[in-house]
Regions:
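Long, hydrophobic alpha-helical segments
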Residues: 6-32
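Helix-loop-helix units of permease transmembrane domains in multi-pass membrane transporters
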Residues: 27-58
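Short cytosolic juxtamembrane segments of multi-pass membrane proteins
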Residues: 214-220
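Cytoplasmic juxtamembrane interface segments
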Residues: 101-147
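Terminal transmembrane helical anchor/hairpin motif
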Residues: 130-205, 209-213
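Transmembrane alpha-helical core residues of multi-pass small-molecule transporters
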Residues: 56, 90, 122-126, 199, ...
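Secretory targeting signals
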Residues: 1-16, 55-119
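Hydrophobic/aromatic residues in alpha-helical transmembrane segments
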Residues: 21-25, 34-35, 101, 121, ...
Length: 220
C-alpha cells in the first residue's frame, strides 16, 4: 500500500534528513573556508558567494533525496499518491531548512568542533526536546485553554510542521497527535496544510537571511 509506505518513510525523513543536512552543511561550510577567502579576494559580492554555496549544497542534497526516494517508489507503486508528493516536499523542505541553520551556525562559530556540537544540539532540540517541552507546558497548565498557544508553538519547530503536513494529508486522527489534531480542527486539512507549508518555507528564508547578514559582516 503506497500510503503505508509513505507513513513508514515519514519517521526516517523527519529524523535522518535534518540530521544529515545540518551536520553535512556545517562540515561543508568549514571545509570551504579557504575557498571562500580566495573568492572574496576577487570582485565577487558576498551575497552571490553565500547563496552560491548554499544552493550548491542544497540542490544536490535535494536531488539525491528525490532520486533515492522517488524512483524506487515509482518503480514499485506506479503513479504516486498525494501523500507521497507531500513526503517529497517535506524532505526537500527540511533539507533546505537545516542546511540554512547549519550555515548560520557555521558563520557565527569560528571553531569547527564547537559549531558541529551546536548543530547536533539544535537537531536534538527540534527532534526530541521540543515536543517534551510542549507536553510539559500542557501538563503544567492543563487547567487553562492552551489550544492557540499550542498552535503557535508548533510553528516554531520545522520537524513538527513536516509531521503535521504528512498526517493532515492522510487524515489519520490517531497518529496526528495533539498539534496535528488542533491544526485539523482550527484550520481544516487544506488550509492547515497551506499554513504549515508557508511556515516551513519561512523557516528556510529566515536562517538564510540571518546567515547572510552574519556572513556579510564577518571578517575573514
Amino acid at each position: 500500500d503506497p500510503g503505508q509506505v509513505s507513513l513508514s518513510l515519514m519517521n526516517v525523513v523527519l529524523f535522518i534528513i535534518p540530521l544529515v543536512s545540518i551536520v553535512f552543511g556545517t562540515m561543508f561550510f568549514y571545509n570551504s573556508r579557504e575557498f571562500m577567502e580566495l573568492l572574496l579576494s576577487q570582485p565577487i559580492s558576498r551575497v552571490a558567494l553565500f547563496l552560491g554555496l548554499y544552493l550548491g549544497l542544497t540542490l544536490p542534497l535535494s536531488a539525491v533525496y528525490l532520486i533515492g526516494v522517488g524512483i524506487p517508489f515509482m518503480y514499485h507503486a506506479g503513479i504516486m499518491t498525494g501523500g507521497y508528493w507531500i513526503l517529497l516536499l517535506v524532505g526537500v523542505s527540511l533539507t533546505w531548512v537545516f542546511t540554512a541553520l547549519a550555515f548560520f551556525i557555521a558563520v557565527l562559530s569560528e571553531q569547527r568542533v564547537k559549531g558541529i556540537g551546536m548543530t547536533i544540539v539544535l537537531w536534538l532540540f527540534f527532534a526530541i526536546l521540543y515536543d517534551g517541552i510542549i507536553l510539559f507546558i500542557l501538563f503544567a497548565l492543563e487547567e487553562y485553554p492552551l489550544e492557540k498557544l499550542t498552535l503557535i508553538l508548533s510553528l516554531f519547530n520545522p520537524i513538527d510542521l513536516g509531521r503535521i503536513l504528512m498526517l493532515l494529508q492522510f487524515d489519520i486522527a490517531a497518529l496526528m497527535g495533539y498539534t496535528g489534531a488542533l491544526f485539523s480542527k482550527f484550520y481544516g486539512n487544506m488550509f492547515g496544510s497551506a499554513v504549515a507549508v508557508l511556515a516551513l518555507w519561512t523557516w528556510v528564508a529566515t536562517p538564510v537571511w540571518l546567515g547572510y547578514r552574519a556572513f556579510s559582516r564577518k571578517d575573514f
